[in-house]
Regions:
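Juxtacatalytic substrate-recognition/specificity segment
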Residues: 2-114, 125-134, 142-150, 154-172, ...
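Beta/coil-rich, acidic/histidine-enriched accessory regions frequently appended to metallopeptidases
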Residues: 5-9, 167-171, 197-303
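Alpha-helix N-cap and coil->helix boundary residues
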Residues: 42, 112, 116-117, 190-191, ...
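Active-site catalytic microenvironments for nucleophilic, acid-base chemistry
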Residues: 107, 128, 182-186, 198
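Acidic helix/loop microenvironments that form the catalytic cleft of cell-wall polysaccharide enzymes
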Residues: 119-127, 190-204
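Substrate-binding/catalytic groove segments of enzymes
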Residues: 132-133, 183-194
């Protein structure tokens, strides 16, 4: 049974370098998702890649200035090319993987999957099967989860559609990914596939949970909160010292107090080693190492 092919539409100047990589990565994701979701796509996947972010924004939402990286409409997905954004602004391969997961969750449910599960599965697939594996969560998301800002699973769509505080959409993406991670660990990946099947038949979140894992949303929310505490309790407890050390490292580096910058940055990174957001302690740490002539350490820090 031959897999449907991938059609790539992109700027001719970039296609020689990028198109083979796109086809290979899209093909790998399709081989993986076809097996995992037990679903064969019926038509080719069309991947449109824009080397100008404003063109992409107008094509996908009808307005420039949009902050999205990729958008999926069934078996057509549109995304920025690596050259349309600053270096290090996003990992391009992970974004493609994320969007390809949407193709499967949308198509396999006849587009009935709720936003929270489609986004959750895409984030979860980035972490589990994507080109850069491992759970990666920004500090502000940990802070929101520690402050009990996680929505109940039956309300989670609201966090995407009607956010009530800054960064709630991003927090909801991460929470949805963690909900999928939790279901997989506690009940097994198959239950996520069962839920997709239920949504495809028109069930709501409450009914899909009941069929797949036999519990109501309120009970699920309680167990999910326990899971967060178990997984990230140490990080939650360390958020205040993390934030203080992070700030201290920046301040010390701006004053050229390199010893303090190194000590503070290392304290912050002990708590959140994956902190690569704006204001990351890796920046003052590398600055200090270079300033003290520790060029090899500086290079390692920036990698």
């Amino acid at each position: 049974n031959s897999a449907p092919q991938v059609v790539v539409r992109m700027n001719r100047k970039e296609s020689a370098v990028l198109a083979p990589y796109v086809r290979r990565l899209a093909g790998q994701s399709m081989a993986s998702f076809q097996k995992r979701y037990r679903f064969q796509l019926k038509s080719p996947v069309v991947i449109e890649i824009y080397n100008n972010h404003e063109d992409f924004a107008v094509r996908t939402a009808g307005m420039p200035g949009l902050g999205l990286l990729g958008v999926t409409f069934g078996n057509v997905l549109a995304m920025d090319s690596p050259s349309s954004r600053a270096v290090n602004e996003f990992h391009w391969g992970s974004t493609l993987w994320h969007e390809m997961a949407h193709v499967y969750t949308l198509e396999s449910t006849g587009h009935r999957v709720p936003r929270w599960l489609s986004e959750g599965m895409s984030v979860y697939e980035e972490w589990r099967t994507g080109p850069i594996k491992g759970i990666s969560i920004p500090g502000y998301v940990y802070a929101a989860l520690a402050a009990n800002k996680a929505l109940g699973v039956a309300e989670l769509d609201r966090g995407f559609i009607r956010p009530e505080y800054e960064q709630q959409v991003q927090v909801s993406y991460m929470q949805a990914g963690l909900v999928c991670e939790f279901i997989d660990r506690r009940w097994g990946f198959d239950k996520l596939v069962t839920m997709l099947g239920e949504f495809g038949r028109g069930a709501d979140t409450s009914a899909a949970l009941k069929t797949a894992i036999g519990i109501a949303p309120a009970d699920f929310d309680r167990q999910f909160r326990e899971f967060l505490q178990q997984e990230f309790g140490t990080v939650f407890a360390g958020l205040k010292p993390w934030s203080e050390s992070r700030r201290a490292a920046m301040t010390a580096a701006s004053r050229k107090d390199w010893k303090t910058a190194i000590a503070s940055a290392q304290s912050a990174l002990k708590i959140l080693p994956n902190d690569v957001e704006d204001g990351s302690p890796y920046v003052p740490l590398a600055q200090a190492q270079y300033a003290l002539g520790e060029n090899q350490q500086g290079r390692t820090t920036l990698e």
